[in-house]
Amino acid sequence: IGRIEHGFRMRPDLVATDNARNPRDYFGHIYFDSCVHDDAALRYLIDVAGIDSVMLGTDYPFPLGEQEPGSGIIALKLSNVEQSRLFHGTALEWLNLPYSRFAQDDTE
């Protein structure tokens, strides 16, 4: 995003020809998956895009995903709330589905 934003600011004649909106303003409207195969890259993605824009990725049906899906998320040693956000919260929000639809009711 830094390179695109730099072009937007420095060369609007090339980059901002059809849109006066800064490319960084689109963050929060774009979603990313966690399957980046690098702990530092995942940390950076979360820091730049925001945890609310990142969700678990598996690369299914392709055989290039993590050996254990979610292991990259676990490796970051995030809080339980942050892990829950990445494992299911962001996806449920994006799909406009309530958590209760999938949660087990332990009160019965």
Model segments located where?
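Aromatic-lined glycan-binding groove of carbohydrate-active enzymes
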Residues: 1-27
